[in-house]
Amino acid sequence: MRYRTVLFDLDGTLIDSGEIILSSFRHATNTVLGRRIPDEVLAAAVGGSNIYDQMRAFDEERVDELVRVYREHNEPLHDDLVAFEGIERVLERFEAEGRQLGIVTAKRRKTVDLAFAILPLERYFETVVTSEQTAHHKPHPEPVLTALDRLGSSPGEAAFVGDSPFDMGAGKAAGVFTVAVSWGKIHPVERLRETGADTVVDSPEELLDVL
């Protein structure tokens, strides 16, 4: 066991929510702003700050309306969520090894609970850090450091697994080992490699080898 503590992002890392998120961004920007924004531009905002900051990139004056329309479209779609193939087997293995597991997400707690109501994953995690629980958001290190503090762990014995440049930035700033996953379907793997992640994996099973 290289790392006693393993932190995970949620969307695009544990759960296959990429298309749900992008379709919700498309719906909100089309409905509120009346224009189609390219998917690559929408995707670039996903995974970092809370949803209000993400929407601010598209229109400073209509953030509240964008968020409202996004959530109206997004929340019912959580009924269709699935975990990525192989993720639960990895979590079971880590649990059996006695590792401390946590989640660090840009989602608010209410939306996390919608996902956990469908997917039986919460039992594996000792802590879940959501967007309303920290003053700063990824790529700032505060969410990662908050999770470590709750777990009584330190950066030198921890890893952070995520699918976005924001995850890698937060992990690097916090001083933990960073693992970028290529299966998230939102951020191009080339962009993840450019972030300086300590390693990039292409399947959940590879986490057993690198961690």
Predicted regions and their residues:
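Structural recognition of alpha->loop->beta junctions
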Residues: 120-130, 191-211
